[in-house]
Design a protein with these regions (language model features):
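Nucleotide-activated donor-dependent transferases that construct or modify glycoconjugates
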Residues: 2-18, 61
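Conserved SAM/AdoMet-binding glycine-rich loop
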Residues: 2-6, 252, 256-351
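N-terminal pre-triad scaffold of radical SAM enzymes
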Residues: 20, 174-241, 256, 263, ...
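Glycine- and acidic-residue-enriched helix-capping/strand-helix junction motifs
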Residues: 12-27, 295-302
């Protein structure tokens, strides 16, 4: 099998006005899934594919990741793929959440939500041979949509991974060298997945839409999970809680190993990625209940200290040859103690 993973994130209509400065974790995560079963994928930034630096006819499976705004670019690469290769085209990432996406870009399969276990299942059904599984088999795979003679079939979402399942995954690190400017770019490393903001956006909603039961703000952690009126959780513009659920943290060991290997490859700007960095380890404080409260409990100071101190001791970071920063955080968790920890290890960096 010879799969090609195309990173089209943040490429919009296919032209950028500035050099790529950010390398997300998604493509490396999918590459890690393939590597875990002995398949060596090629990761290609979309700009190189657009310059025709890759002969698509030599690959038998295309995996494209992108955002909703990247639709023109994704459509263009799939159109070219269909002309030059006979293998299936699969799309993932935020763009795959659109129920009409397959009809719009003419891909064969879309993976919605957490894609790692879904991809493994598809590979076991024949995708590893460069063929699309039979329709009867696809109908049983959760977390996908696929094209049929009658249109698009959208299957139910796959249940979210447990923290242990999530922590068992190992993103690829050597494929970072596929990006020409990886030594200068900010390279994202996922430290947790999901979001604790299970408040529902209310605003001026009618009583028929929201009866102001306040369950999502004052109920127990389990009670906040589902809304009686089926309003999606989180910020009104964001799908993270709906797709990925409450936060689940990776172990310090797995994060440390990934960062260490990336530094060894030559990466010099590490960004610890999370919808809210101060959620790291908070899920451990409430297990087995889901972390659906964005304010309580307070940050897990011990977990934050262990993570940041361990990473800061890695030679390139400790010696000032590489930098460590975080992606973002939510203000309602910035207690004085948390601020001191962040200032101790991330001084001079931006959030």
């Amino acid at each position: 099998m010879n799969p090609l993973i195309v990173d089209a994130l943040a490429y919009g209509k296919g032209k950028r006005q500035a050099t790529r400065d950010v390398i997300g974790a998604g493509s490396r995560t999918i590459a890690g899934v393939l590597e875990s079963i002995g398949i060596e994928p090629t990761v290609a930034p979309i700009e190189q594919v657009n310059r025709r630096e890759f002969n698509l006819s030599t690959y038998n499976l295309l995996l494209v990741t992108g955002m909703t705004s990247d639709l023109p670019t994704v459509r263009r690469i799939i159109r070219r793929w269909k002309k030059e290769s006979k293998g299936p085209a699969l799309i993932g990432g935020p763009i795959a959440s659109d129920v009409e996406i397959l009809q719009r870009v003419k891909a064969d399969l879309a993976v919605t939500g957490e894609g790692e276990l879904t991809l493994l299942e598809l590979l076991s059904l024949g995708l590893n041979e460069g063929t699309i599984p039979a329709e009867g088999e696809l109908s049983l795979v959760k977390g996908i949509s696929y094209r049929t003679d009658n249109g698009t079939q959208v299957n139910p979402l796959r249940p979210r991974m447990s923290r242990m399942e999530y922590d068992s995954l190992t993103p690829s690190t050597h494929t970072i060298t596929s990006y020409p400017l990886f030594r200068a770019a900010r390279v994202y490393v996922e430290v947790l997945r999901g979001c604790s903001n299970y408040h529902r956006a209310q605003g001026s909603l009618s009583e028929e839409t929201c009866n102001a039961c306040d369950l999502c703000r004052s109920g127990g952690l389990e009670s906040r999970y589902d809304c009686p009126h089926s309003l999606p959780p989180g910020c009104g513009y964001c799908s993270v809680p709906s797709l990925f659920g409450p936060p689940k943290s990776r172990s310090v060991k797995k994060i440390y190993e990934e960062v260490e290997n990336l530094l060894r490859e030559g990466v010099r700007r590490i960004v610890l990625s999370a919808p809210g960095f101060l959620d790291y380890g908070r899920d451990l404080q409430v297990e087995p209940e889901p972390l659906t409260d964005p304010r309580s409990p307070e940050p897990n100071y011990e977990a934050l200290e262990n993570l940041l101190s361990g990473l800061s001791d890695l030679a390139p970071i400790a010696e000032g040859e590489a930098s460590l920063m975080i992606e973002n955080l939510k203000g309602d968790l910035v207690m004085e103690k948390a601020a001191k920890i962040l200032g101790k290890y991330l001084s001079g960096t931006q959030v």
